[in-house]
Amino acid sequence: MVENKSKVKDISLAPFGKMQMEISENEMPGLMRIREEYGKDQPLKNAKITGCLHMTVECALLIETLQKLGAQIRWCSCNIYSTADYAAAAVSTLENVTVFAWKNETLEEYWWCVESALTWGDGDDNGPDMIVDDGGDATLLVHKGVEYEKLYEEKNILPDPEKAKNEEERCFLTLLKNSILKNPKKWTNIAKKIIGVSEETTTGVLRLKKMDKQNELLFTAINVNDAVTKQKYDNVYGCRHSLPDGLMRATDFLISGKIVVICGYGDVGKGCASSMKGLGARVYITEIDPICAIQAVMEGFNVVTLDEIVDKGDFFITCTGNVDVIKLEHLLKMKNNAVVGNIGHFDDEIQVNELFNYKGIHIENVKPQVDRITLPNGNKIIVLARGRLLNLGCATGHPAFVMSFSFCNQTFAQLDLWQNKDTNKYENKVYLLPKHLDEKVALYHLKKLNASLTELDDNQCQFLGVNKSGPFKSNEYRY
């Protein structure tokens, strides 16, 4: 049975959520400009969009923008802790918008929400035209659903939750098993209708590129994460704002003078390290990439291995997009009152499950998303958001102005997919947004900051080989 009614924590929070949305409108000039430019033409009319992205106030304004462009929406969060319940309540009152999201979902509830957001119409195998994804969970569910349905059809083999490596995988496989027993063609039928997905984050893009390389993509994917106006703004400036916000709300510890270890010096790591340095911390970086490592050194940071610094650090932050970055052996060596958190998308950068199941430890919940673990040696360490995104679990994520950049890119990606649904422009591969749209997103935000652009004259344009209106850089240019 298809769930056609929103499921949120408390609908009475909607008025407060709407007020927060109104306040944030002024901080999201890009989205507001898109509404002005495109709203009248309803370019997304009749489009069915499933979103799996953090259900925050800023996300509510993205949903409202897509709705104002004519789309029908079904939405869930991409993290069990990241929903702002007042935002979910507010946006669920909009026409043609159905929301399945609340803070502190269980893993079973989380995957139920993802499945519900992907299931449209009277039949349970009627899905969306397009997906807005963050981390790739909605895309993963469709692809794994098709894979297991094929296995069931050919070999009568069902997903086996007993073979799961962890609790989340068990929930995921249980959902797919039940789904196949109920309708063995559900995900195959849903996948056939999907035009494409626009992916928000590094981890999700990594998943997509793996599938692309193995020719396993079932539909087009647009890589929003690597748009310059996403990667260099959301990833850097967003994390520079929301990491200290999350740490301070969670711990109330002074950061100045402390040793902060940032694992990873990509764009997210750069933003994190910058914020910690600005607060007076002594910042150490761990890196696998010599280019990123030398960038860190040139910015004045110490680059070390985790083994060198693990017993000295006061704060440990992972932001690599990899797995098992901080292992159980590292956690057991940390000094008393060390704080451990993650700002990468998934919870497997830190071996939290291994720690919480380790014999001889004692777990105390200090407050929501803050656990104090007594180790066998008597030291106590503090784990934030159980290894999930601490900036969304312990705070409210990136500020609206930064998210306006990212969500403009998401909107343009959805428009591009929908407008080209009957053309042969895209194959089942991963694509970047074109440069002129990147520049357009930046232009939308300059006025808000009272910035003025210099205009090239005809001679300068001819010399550079560019148009007055851009694009001004080649695709190979590294900002």
UniProtKB/Swiss-Prot annotation:
It catalyses: S-adenosyl-L-homocysteine + H2O = L-homocysteine + adenosine. The keyword Aminoacyl-tRNA synthetase does not apply. Coiled coil: none annotated. GO terms for molecular function: adenosylhomocysteinase activity. The keyword NAD applies. Pathway: Amino-acid biosynthesis; L-homocysteine biosynthesis; L-homocysteine from S-adenosyl-L-homocysteine: step 1/1. The record marks C59 as: Important for nucleoside inhibitor binding. Its cofactor is NAD(+). GO terms for cellular component: cytosol. Pfam families: AdoHcyase (PF05221), AdoHcyase_NAD (PF00670). Its EC number is 3.13.2.1. Homotetramer. Belongs to the adenosylhomocysteinase family. Adenosylhomocysteine is a competitive inhibitor of S-adenosyl-L-methionine-dependent methyl transferase reactions; therefore adenosylhomocysteinase may play a key role in the control of methylations via regulation of the intracellular concentration of adenosylhomocysteine. PANTHER family: ADENOSYLHOMOCYSTEINASE. HAMAP family: AdoHcyase. This is Adenosylhomocysteinase. It comes from Plasmodium falciparum (isolate 3D7).
